Amino acid sequence: MNGIKHIFITGGVVSSIGKGLTAASLGSLLTMRGLKVFIKKLDPYLNVDPGTMNPLQHGEVFITEDGAETDLDVGHYERFLDVDLDRTANVTTGQVYSKVITLERTGRYLGETVQVIPHITDEIKRRIRLAPDDIDVIITEIGGTVGDIESQPFIEAARQIRREVGRENCCFIHVSLVPFLESAGEQKTKPTQHSVAILRAAGIQPDALVLRSDKPISSANQKKIALMCDVSAVVNAVTVPNIYEIPCVLNQHGLDKFVIKHLDLEAGEIDWSYWDDVLDAIENNRSEIEIAIIGKYTGLPDAYISVIEALRAGGFESKTKVNIKWVDSDDENLEDQLENINGACIPGGFGIRGIEGLIKAIRICREREIPTLGICLGMQCMVIEYARHVVGMHGASSTEFTDDTQWPVVTTMLEQRDILIDDQFGGTMRLGSYRAVLSVGSLAASLYGTTDIHERHRHRYEVNNGYAQRLVERGLIVSGRNTEQDLIEFIELDRKDHPFYIGTQAHPECKSRPKRPHPLFKGLVAAALARKEIAEFNSGKTVLQ
């Protein structure tokens, strides 16, 4: 094996077809065979990063250890490969053009006419090749759909890389939809044929096809697609109820073996130990609970995809299936919506819309002693609710929502004030991994099993230290601080007053893994399960174990 091998994942017919999960699953399979894999996503949009994009359009923003605001697929990569990626794992058209224009303005092109080819494509190729020195394979997912005008420079850059490294060192996998028409009663292969034709017109002949469908594709149709697209390796990836089955599906169809042979990789036998326990927990769960995600963007579950997966992982060890109940913070019937839930999670967000609903929901959870985890904005709203209804600071709020509030219990971070004045919103928050010191004997410390931790952050507002003492005097516990900046990172209630009530300024969902569930989510699931078992015991439905 000579040099780094490249695998490119493209998509056809429709977007959101599963390219990211295909890339993550293939990366997991190669990793389980002992290969060192680096994986990245190319996003064709002109935004520099997704940090300022509407979550209802784009989905969640996933934060890396080094503080990059990235596409949600990077979260899938980290969870499936059990790795921590950095900012080089997500490349956007905005980043590429910004860099090229900066180079042009500083005279680095020595008077050349700056063009898409070669200058833009050269910068894309440079970013594709960025990876640790000991990597065997770079998997690159090209976002969007072939034929999109925005994707063309990325497709061309990938074609050039194949030419430069040699066909034997490069593998193109095209993920395409094979739709089933109910009216005709049959699956249609033409969309995939046309998609591959567009790819071939761009100079790329795919080496393998991953055909997405809700129903199995007949052998005849698979052979037809193979013939018409001139591709021998055809995999039918039928929709599965659990995304962690996808590596098994691809392996059963031999995709990883094909890639290894095509690229002449020195790979060992596959080690399924990473997934065996996870799949066993999913398929053989012993109990079920319902946890409400109370948020501003519940219309698009992808806006909270890492929270969803962290909650699911939180139940794997105890073989507890976590069912999600979506509760919109603008819902007028919050009391009824939260009536029979076993636990609640209030994730992050921005802006004033839905805030009063969040505060109302948090009060319900606190007073009903529902196990509750607040994340980022969720923690801030927990503080606001407590200040209003326990401490008596009527009208308490955050300066994010109300500039002239009498009780700004949540306020703009000092270093963020000038940034906001200058309207510099992109990439300027407190981003990345920061240290927190937890109070000995606190719920937080007991969950983490240590008092010295690091978590990923994405915020520009903080709990106001000026009101901390009044909150503490009335029972709110400040259980974790960043000692370098004296920032409040964790709050909670005493376990004598509430079975599980904790908030963090961080985004712990970004560090959860299927085999290593995050302690906060694991704790929430355990508390929710205990609440359910106690309720069933009291109603005579079951006997406590």
From Swiss-Prot:
Chain sites annotated for binding ATP: 16-21, 73
Q: Which residues form the Glutamine amidotransferase type-1 domain?
A: 290-534
One Pfam family this chain carries?
Answer: GATase
What EC number is given for this enzyme?
6.3.4.2
Query: Which residues of this protein are catalytic?
Result: 376 (nucleophile), 507, 509
Q: Which residues bind Mg(2+)?
A: 73, 141
A single cellular component GO annotation: cytosol
Report a single Gene Ontology molecular function: metal ion binding
- CDD domains under this entry? CTPS_N (cd03113), GATase1_CTP_Synthase (cd01746)
Q: Which GO terms describe its biological process?
A: 'de novo' CTP biosynthetic process; pyrimidine nucleobase biosynthetic process
What is noted besides the main data?
A: CTPSs have evolved a hybrid strategy for distinguishing between UTP and CTP. The overlapping regions of the product feedback inhibitory and substrate sites recognize a common feature in both compounds, the triphosphate moiety. To differentiate isosteric substrate and product pyrimidine rings, an additional pocket far from the expected kinase/ligase catalytic site, specifically recognizes the cytosine and ribose portions of the product inhibitor.
Q: What does this protein do?
A: Catalyzes the ATP-dependent amination of UTP to CTP with either L-glutamine or ammonia as the source of nitrogen. Regulates intracellular CTP levels through interactions with the four ribonucleotide triphosphates.
The record's comment on protein family reads: Belongs to the CTP synthase family.
Under the subunit heading, UniProt states: Homotetramer.
This one is known as CTP synthase
**Organism lineage string:** Bacteria, Bacillati, Actinomycetota, Actinomycetes, Micrococcales
